[in-house]
């Protein structure tokens, strides 16, 4: 008999054995999902494969740092594994034919573990890529000490090891079991199920599904809730790093515009490419945050629903809400891996151009230094021609106008600000004449000194 504190009740709203076949969705949903999954699978595999090739081309041509390339390649590989490991098995065992016998326990465990590991590898890759850009933009001096092939390998290794640890509990908590088996020592609803068919032999009637094992309920709950915390931490961290990077770029822009003088105007011109690349990175990371929030949240809600209470305590409305959410959450989750190549194309015109070239198998991208070397060579040739055709001593007005134009072309070939070691060289370039007027920031004076030396 039930204890007086927990009287036996007839829970008419709680699901029973008659609802177990409803774990299999309707036929029209199956057909719709197979078409949607097929499109997502092809686009996802193709997009991420081309992304790997594009990043390698950009890195070889000098447009992308090797550290960023390694992160993007590893992220694309994790997305591809999500499709290869997760989509076929999940569609067959959860959507198309969820009701089976306990003989598929090993495949259920292995699939769940690998799928969870690859999914969170994608999530953590977004975190490490954001962290790498955050250090490069907000802490550039630390970036040189923290960047490098060894550090990148350690970060990527950290991602995969952590993902495996996050997924490891599911290797023990998942299996093939009748979904309405009572969880031992669980204080849930106490209902009179004497008139239901819970005591039938589900093994003989093919009523088992790949689900959490009742004997490992605590392990399953801990795994799902811990993974959800990891998801929230990644979202908050990436959002914070994007906000910090935007603040740094905004302060840098305001400082350049507020300054006066020829030298600071040249600094604005020479750093325009680097600031444009940084803006593209931030746009990409912002879109990644939105994607993670929109595409991952339905799947996280469904997982929380599964871990909040055992299935034998689910009400009919709770069960129907779960089954309605199931196809939508899975579809949006796979879209998060499809959308990464799309975000690369949206946030970077250069990436979009090379992406199209790779699809057409016609690579026409020149090396990044080719145009710079050409401009420098033309500027050097013109400067040598002028120096050979004019006298050594010029009036101050002519020297100022001509040398300012020459230095404008010369300094435009640089893409980073002068290092502190270059300051003594600027001081040594002053004219030795005591009566001459000179300003350290005036490019005409420096060019005049070069003519004086000639």
UniProtKB/Swiss-Prot annotation:
Annotated signal sequence range: none
Record membrane topology: Multi-pass membrane protein
Any matching Pfam family: 7tm_1
Keyword DNA repair applies: no
GO BP term, example: G protein-coupled receptor signaling pathway
GO CC terms of this entry: plasma membrane
Binding of Zn(2+), residues: 17, 19
CDD domains associated with the record: 7tmA_GPR39
Family: Belongs to the G-protein coupled receptor 1 family.
UniProt function note: Zinc-sensing receptor that can sense changes in extracellular Zn(2+), mediate Zn(2+) signal transmission, and participates in the regulation of numerous physiological processes including glucose homeostasis regulation, gastrointestinal mobility, hormone secretion and cell death. Activation by Zn(2+) in keratinocytes increases the intracellular concentration of Ca(2+) and activates the ERK/MAPK and PI3K/AKT signaling pathways leading to epithelial repair.
The protein's name in its UniProt record: G-protein coupled receptor 39
Organism: Bos taurus
Gene: GPR39
């Amino acid at each position: 008999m039930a204890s007086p504190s927990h009287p036996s009740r007839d829970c008419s709203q709680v699901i029973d054995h008659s609802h177990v076949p409803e774990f299999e969705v309707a036929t029209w949903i199956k057909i719709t999902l197979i078409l949607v999954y097929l499109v997502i699978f092809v686009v996802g595999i193709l997009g991420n494969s081309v992304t790997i090739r594009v990043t390698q081309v950009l890195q070889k041509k000098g447009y992308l740092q090797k550290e960023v390339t390694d992160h993007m390649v590893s992220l694309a590989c994790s997305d591809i594994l999500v499709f290869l490991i997760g989509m076929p098995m999940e569609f067959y065992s959860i959507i198309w034919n969820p009701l089976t016998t306990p003989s598929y326990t090993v495949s259920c465990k292995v699939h769940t573990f690998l799928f969870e590991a690859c999914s969170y590898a994608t999530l953590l890759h977004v975190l490490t890529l954001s962290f790498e850009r955050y250090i490069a933009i907000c802490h550039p001096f630390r970036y040189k000490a923290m960047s490098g092939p060894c550090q990148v390998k350690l970060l990527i290794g950290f991602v995969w090891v952590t993902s495996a640890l996050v997924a490891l509990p599911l290797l023990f908590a998942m299996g093939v079991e009748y979904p309405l088996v009572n969880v031992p020592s669980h204080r849930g609803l106490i209902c009179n199920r004497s008139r239901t068919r819970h005591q039938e032999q589900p093994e003989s009637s093919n009523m088992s599904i790949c689900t959490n094992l009742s004997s490992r309920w605590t392990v399953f709950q801990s795994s799902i809730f811990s993974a959800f915390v990891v998801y929230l931490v990644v979202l908050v961290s990436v959002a914070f790093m994007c906000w910090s990077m935007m603040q740094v770029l905004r302060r840098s822009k305001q400082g350049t515009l507020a300054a006066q003088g020829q030298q600071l105007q040249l600094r604005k011109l020479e750093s325009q490419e680097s600031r444009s690349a940084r803006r593209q990175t931030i746009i990409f990371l912002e879109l990644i945050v939105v994607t993670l929030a929109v595409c991952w949240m339905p799947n996280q809600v469904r997982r929380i629903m599964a871990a909040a209470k055992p299935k034998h305590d689910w009400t009919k409305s709770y069960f129907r809400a779960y089954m309605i959410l199931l196809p939508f959450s899975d579809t949006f989750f796979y879209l998060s891996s499809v959308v990464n190549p799309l975000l690369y194309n949206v946030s970077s015109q250069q990436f979009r151009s090379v992406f199209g070239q790779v699809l057409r198998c016609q690579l026409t991208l020149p090396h990044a230094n080719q145009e710079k070397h050409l401009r420098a060579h033309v500027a050097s040739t013109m400067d040598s021609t002028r120096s050979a055709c004019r006298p050594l001593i010029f009036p101050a007005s002519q020297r100022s106008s001509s040398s300012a134009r020459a230095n404008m072309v010369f300094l435009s070939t640089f893409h980073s600000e002068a290092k502190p070691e270059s300051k003594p060289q600027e001081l040594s370039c002053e004219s030795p004449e005591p009566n001459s007027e000179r300003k350290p920031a005036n490019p005409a004076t420096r060019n005049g000194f070069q003519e004086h030396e000639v």
